[in-house]
Amino acid sequence: VEAILDVALELVVEQGAEALAMREVARRAGVQISSVYQYFPSKAAIIRELATRNLERVHLILEREVGDLFAEHDGRPTPAQAVNRVVDAYYAHYRDQPAAVAVWAGAQSDHGLRELDIEDSRRTAEFLVPSLMEILSLTDTQDVFALALLLAETTGAVARLALAVEAPLRDQLVAKLKVMLIATLEASQANGRAA
């Protein structure tokens, strides 16, 4: 299974998810086509597994970064510290892992896989809610969930957009994302509710 996924990932990076061919995966992995179909009944199933693995890596990075953030700031990071830490980690993952961007692009082209991305944004938001409630001193879980979902989806979209454009604009997009997110969190904190 791992050999099949490794080859599939190489092909997605080289040619894009749309061009992924099961026969080529089998050929490069050195297995019979029936072996590929035994584990993955379709190209979408391969992309789904690659996307799921990437999303799990991102979630582990996020857990580590949020834990470190709270530890380094005695449990009381500012909105700016939180945004800078999380955006930098998220962006670095996609910048340093071009395969992750290729898999994400492939997942976006399939409606069923887009649902996986939305589910992951919800999972990320659920993870962020307690931290945001602590950072912002807010108590309305549903309100903070909506804010966290917006932050998760916006961060992902802008990070991937930044990687698709040239370097000067790339840095500007990430910087402006941070300004926007910090302003949103600080406004929520000042209002006593998610803005």
Regions found by a protein language model. Name each.
Residues V12, I47-N54, D117-D120:
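Alpha-helical DNA-contacting segments of helix-turn-helix folds
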Residues R122-V129, T141-A162, Q172-T184:
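Hydrophobic alpha-helical segments that form the core
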Residues I4-V12, N54, V58, Y90, ...:
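Short hydrophobic clusters on alpha-helical segments that form packing/core surfaces
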Residues A3, A45, Q81-R85, A89, ...:
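Amphipathic alpha-helical interaction segments
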Residues A3, V7, L11-A45, E49:
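Helix-turn-helix
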Residues E49, R64-R95, L151:
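Hydrophobic alpha-helical connector segments
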Residues F70-R76, R95-R114, R122-A148, S188-G192:
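Hydrophobic alpha-helical bundle segments that form small-molecule/ligand-binding pockets
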Residues P41-A45, E49, D74, R95, ...:
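Residues in soluble alpha-helical coiled-coils and helical-bundle/repeat scaffolds
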